[in-house]
């Protein structure tokens, strides 16, 4: 994600929260010029540490989202802060998205689920993936409320109208002033909504889609590569949703190449670095739901690729 911003954006600075010591060590060794690396020991406060034992690793990461934004705004006195998921990849400068919010204080990004796959009721209207808060009265009021709410309850389950850190955002357009919902379709492309759009072409870093509903073209700003997972024997799983082969070949394959380049870069500065991959087997898929998904993928042979074959077929991209 950092490298994609380097290619597409002249002016940015990332505040990267390293959630384990090894990540912090490697990120500091990389000497990223436009990034500040923040360790857990510097970031965690008493409230976060108090609830940490009651959350899984994933739930704790979700719990911390609002706190990371608040930390950056207060610690570094920045005028605004945009939270980014680490599995985003940018194809053009996100300034076009930030400009859209105008004088508003908060920018939200919808999931944009298609009707046949609408999980709004359980997962939320908005996706915590690209989320901006301005350091003003309206922005900080919402941010502090969100942090307190996530510390009180943030779990990987639907309960009483809540789910993780996301469902809390559902009523913000009426709860708070200065909230803008992103309209640019190029911001928020992901496996759960890309089937609504037809891939048209990719020229370098310029990716063009066609929106069937509005009968119009738009350029991708970023894509959310949710649930891309690597396994032993050069296997990559692209997730549960089923993107078309043009999307796989023009977005996923180049993304896999970029991840492998970054792995090699890390190995250059840390000879002992090794990713402990699992076998792509039924036993390594936790829970009944994931086991069923695994069986479907094996039987119907979709979304699971050999990385070498995938890259070889798209070496000219």
Model feature map: region roles:
Residues 1-317:
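Glycosyltransferase catalytic domains, chiefly GT-A lineage
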